[in-house]
Design a protein with these regions (language model features):
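Gly/Ser-rich, low-complexity
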Residues: 1-72, 87-97, 107-177, 216-221, ...
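Membrane-embedded alpha-helices of multi-pass transport/permease systems
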Residues: 75, 120-127, 184-187, 191, ...
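Extended serine/threonine-enriched, polar tracts that run as long, contiguous segments within proteins
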Residues: 182-189, 193-196, 200-239
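Hydrophobic alpha-helical transmembrane segments
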Residues: 66-79, 196
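Transmembrane alpha-helical segments of multi-pass small-molecule transport proteins
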Residues: 74-81, 171-173, 200-204
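Membrane-water interface regions at transmembrane-helix termini and the short interhelical loops
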Residues: 81-94, 182-186, 214-215
């Protein structure tokens, strides 16, 4: 009878051990892929990230948004002219230099909305130069190795059924968590670029407000937000560099499960840090 029970216990151990190893094998592949691609993705210009999408955004901005910006600019220019005339007693005390100032401001505003995309790309050229230069300095291996898992299987068979069942539940939860974290990293990196495309599509409207002091805060805040999105890539690289240092300090050895939980914790910390990069850059640049 004891032999039968031992055989059943060994059979259950074999099933649980196989399940644990199945859950843990390739555990870090998705996260390694996403983290490894971060530097390449954040270092790509909006025009190069997805050229077809960028061409569509540019066409929409020029054909749909730009005419609206022209109407806004016309209203602002007329309002500025009327205000200038009324402030100087209906031209009785009017100085010719003021009309030249108005013409100059209006011409600059027209030039800005006509060359909106060149200005926007110049902003991202500056920020991407910072990102590309920093990527050469910030270097680190972000890949998590699971070589220690091969030593884990032999030690699992020495454990009792209850402990193995607990480890099986942990490994199942860890597997789901790591896949969710890889999706979160993907969403953060690609969501930033989609946010950039959305900001760029409406660029002519805030650019049209630079012609008046009362409304120019809209355009100024817009440029701050653009710089914040650009420099967010720099902070993302810093987060990845810190993650690379932390992750290499973890060795999957005898106590593999605890080591894996440490890696999960560092990956959660990475995701949280990536989420915070947007608010940090906006706070530093005073954008809202």
């Amino acid at each position: 009878m004891e032999t039968v029970l031992k055989a059943i216990a060994d059979w259950i151990k074999g099933i649980l051990t196989a399940g644990i190893m199945s859950n843990l094998s390739g555990l870090f592949d998705d996260v390694n892929t996403q983290v490894g691609n971060i530097a390449q993705q954040v270092g790509t210009k909006p025009s190069s990230f997805e050229p077809r999408v960028f061409a569509m955004i540019e066409a929409l901005s020029r054909n749909v948004v730009l005419p609206i910006a022209g109407v806004i600019l016309t209203f602002i220019a007329c309002h500025e002219l009327i205000q200038m005339i009324t402030e100087h007693n209906n031209l009785v005390q009017f100085e010719p230099a003021l009309i030249l100032k108005w013409i100059f401001k209006t011409a600059i505003s027209v030039w800005m909305i006509s060359n909106t995309f060149d200005i926007i790309m110049a902003v991202f050229d500056i920020t991407q130069k910072v990102v590309s230069d920093s990527s050469g300095i910030i270097a680190g291996n972000t890949r998590v190795n699971d070589i220690g898992l091969s030593m884990l299987q032999s030690s699992l068979m020495q454990m009792d059924v209850g402990s193995l069942f607990g480890l099986f539940l942990q490994s199942f939860f860890i597997g789901i968590t790591m896949r969710i974290l890889s999706i979160v990293i993907f969403v953060i990196v690609y969501g930033r670029m989609i946010e950039i495309y959305c900001m760029v599509s409406l660029a002519p409207i805030p650019m049209a407000t630079f012609g008046t002091h009362e409304q120019s805060h809209m355009g100024q805040n817009y440029l701050k937000c653009l710089f914040a999105l650009g420099f967010q890539g720099f902070l993302i690289l810093i987060c990845v560099a810190i993650y690379a240092v932390l992750i290499q300090s973890v060795a999957i050895s005898g106590d593999a499960i605890n080591s894996i939980w440490s890696i999960v914790g560092y990956t959660v910390l990475l995701c949280f840090s990536l989420f915070k990069t947007s608010s940090v850059t906006k706070s530093v640049l005073g954008a809202h």
